[in-house]
């Protein structure tokens, strides 16, 4: 109800306000009528589409998605098709309610997800070690770019985590809220190192 009231009041001021959030609770709550996936339909706010995220790259176990080995799964393929259409038959009433993403502030970065899903025993410090001076020749880099291409061509609102445009890694830390700056900081030198990926994303 709070979100609905905020939407109602802000759109009176400016119809271009964008209000979005996570359609799930962060834990136990005494509130009985929260907003859950699909219940926001026609309420004029947007939600993170984690079903589309998981179809693209796999869940946070980590598992595989369309880009990294699960492209023959009928369920995965239908979720990709539905996500490309803005999830208007499963999650939203229109595509503007869908925040399309492959990574965000929590869980694995897109790059870490790709590497970890292919090598579960990969250790901290070993991420991005096997990228040559020609990154576009790297199979994992091409998977990363495929994920971004899907996001940017899907109906809905594309969302990327800062640094994803140059293969951001948190060295496999999928829950880094209390980790060091070394893990959480943006390594701006990576923009120059992976300028081809940055330019592709731009």
What residues fall within each predicted segment?
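Conserved alpha/beta catalytic core and glycan-binding cleft of carbohydrate-active enzymes
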Residues: 7, 16-162, 166-167, 175-177
């Amino acid at each position: 109800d709070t979100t609905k009231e905020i939407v109602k009041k802000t759109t009176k001021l400016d119809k271009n306000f964008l209000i979005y959030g996570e359609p799930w609770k962060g834990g136990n709550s005494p509130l009985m009528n929260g907003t859950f996936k699909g219940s926001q339909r026609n309420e004029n706010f947007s939600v993170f589409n984690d079903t589309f995220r998981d179809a693209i790259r796999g869940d946070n176990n980590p598992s595989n998605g369309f880009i990294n080995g699960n492209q023959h799964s009928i369920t995965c393929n239908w979720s990709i098709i539905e996500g490309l259409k803005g999830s208007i038959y499963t999650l939203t009433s229109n595509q503007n309610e869908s925040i399309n993403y492959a990574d965000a502030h929590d869980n694995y970065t897109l790059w870490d997800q790709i590497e970890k899903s292919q090598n579960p025993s990969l250790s901290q410090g070993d991420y991005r070690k096997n990228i040559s001076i020609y990154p576009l020749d790297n199979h994992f880099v091409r998977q990363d770019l495929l994920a971004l291409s899907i996001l940017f061509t899907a109906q809905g609102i594309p969302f990327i985590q800062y640094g994803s445009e140059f293969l951001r890694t948190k060295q496999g830390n999928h829950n880094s809220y209390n980790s060091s700056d070394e893990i959480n900081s943006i390594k701006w030198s990576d923009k120059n190192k992976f300028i081809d990926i940055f330019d592709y994303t731009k």
